[in-house]
Swiss-Prot record:
Function of the molecule: Involved in the viral transport within, and between cells.
InterPro entries from the UniProt entry: Gemini_mov
GO cellular component: host cell membrane; membrane
Protein name in UniProt: Movement protein
Pfam families on file: Gemini_mov
Residue spans crossing the bilayer: 30-50
Species per Swiss-Prot/TrEMBL record: Maize streak virus genotype A (isolate Kenya) (MSV)
Record region (Disordered): 75-101
Length: 101
């Protein structure tokens, strides 16, 4: 190589590292973070809105919310608890006196 042409022939230096044939790790990180955020949003939506909406919809089908809380056991409505009136009061019995009655 003569010195006159040395100015035109400079050594070739790569400007960037060659890329490997695959998905870049930054893209994998973005997908993982977005999936995690979406999962948290869905969980909070369930806690604040969807759980109450499910209870309301099931209650409209004829089941009370107490029945929903205790699961799928059917309530026996054929033998309800009777309303027993309170025993009659004897009026004011007065002060307690030991040794009487």
């Amino acid at each position: 190589m003569d010195p006159q042409n040395a100015l035109y022939y400079q050594p070739r230096v790569p400007t960037a590292a060659p890329t490997s044939g695959g998905v870049p790790w930054s893209r994998v990180g973005e997908v993982a973070i977005l999936s995690f955020v979406a999962l948290i949003c869905f969980y909070l939506l369930y806690l604040w809105v969807l759980r109450d909406l499910i209870l309301v919809l099931k209650a409209r089908q004829g089941r009370s919310t107490e029945e929903l809380i205790f699961g799928g056991q059917a309530v026996d409505r054929s033998n309800p608890i009777p309303n027993i009136p309170a025993p009659p009061s004897q009026g004011n019995p007065g002060p307690f006196v030991p040794g009487t009655g």
